[in-house]
C-alpha cells in the first residue's frame, strides 16, 4: 500500500482534494479529525486517560465522552487543551500506524488527511506528502 499524506491550511480544500482522490483512485481515506473522535470512544486508547484527567462529568449517560462538555473545558483553558492534544495526537498517529501495518502488503493507496502533518510527525508515515494551497485573495 502506498501512503499519501494530504495537508493544507484551514479552508484550503484538503478535504475536497482527499475525497476526490478517494473517489477517482479507489483509495482508502483516513481523516485525522475523525480519528480524533475514534480514539476517544470507550475502550479506545485515549478514553481512560481523558476520563481520568477531566473526571466523570465529561461522560455521557451512554458511557461515551460528552464532547460538548469536554469542549467547554478545553476551549476555556489553554493548559487543558494542550494536555488533551498531547493525548489525542499520539493516539491518532498510533491508529494510523496500525492501519498502515495491517494493510502494508496490500496494493492500493492510503490517503491521510490532516492539517497538522508535520507538527504531529504524521509525515514520517507517508511515502509522499501533498500540500493543498490556495493563495489569499487580495
Residue ranges and their predicted role:
Residues 27-40:
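Short beta-strand-centered segment that lines the nucleotide-binding/catalytic pocket of NTP-utilizing
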Residues 37-108:
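ATP-dependent small-molecule kinase phosphotransfer cores
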Residues 12:
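ATP-binding Walker
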Residues 15:
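Walker A/P-loop
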Residues 95-105, 109-138:
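ATP-dependent NMP and nucleoside kinases share a basic, alpha-helical "lid"
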Residues 4-6:
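Hydrophobic anchor at the beta1->P-loop junction of P-loop NTPases
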Residues 9:
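P-loop (Walker A) phosphate-binding loop of NTP-binding proteins
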Amino acid at each position: 500500500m502506498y501512503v499519501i499524506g494530504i495537508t493544507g491550511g484551514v479552508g484550503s480544500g484538503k478535504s475536497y482534494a482527499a475525497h476526490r482522490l478517494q473517489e477517482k483512485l479507489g483509495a482508502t481515506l483516513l481523516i485525522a479529525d475523525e480519528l480524533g473522535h475514534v480514539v476517544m470512544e470507550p475502550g479506545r486508547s485515549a478514553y481512560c486517560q481523558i476520563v481520568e484527567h477531566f473526571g466523570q462529568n465529561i461522560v455521557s449517560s451512554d458511557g461515551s465522552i460528552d464532547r460538548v462538555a469536554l469542549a467547554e473545558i478545553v476551549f476555556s483553558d489553554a493548559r487543558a487543551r494542550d494536555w488533551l492534544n498531547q493525548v489525542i495526537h499520539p493516539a491518532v498517529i498510533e491508529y494510523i500506524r496500525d492501519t498502515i501495518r495491517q494493510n502494508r502488503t496490500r496494493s492500493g493507496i492510503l490517503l491521510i488527511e490532516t492539517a497538522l502533518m508535520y507538527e504531529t510527525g504524521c509525515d514520517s508515515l507517508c511515502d509522499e506528502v501533498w500540500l493543498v494551497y490556495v493563495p489569499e485573495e487580495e
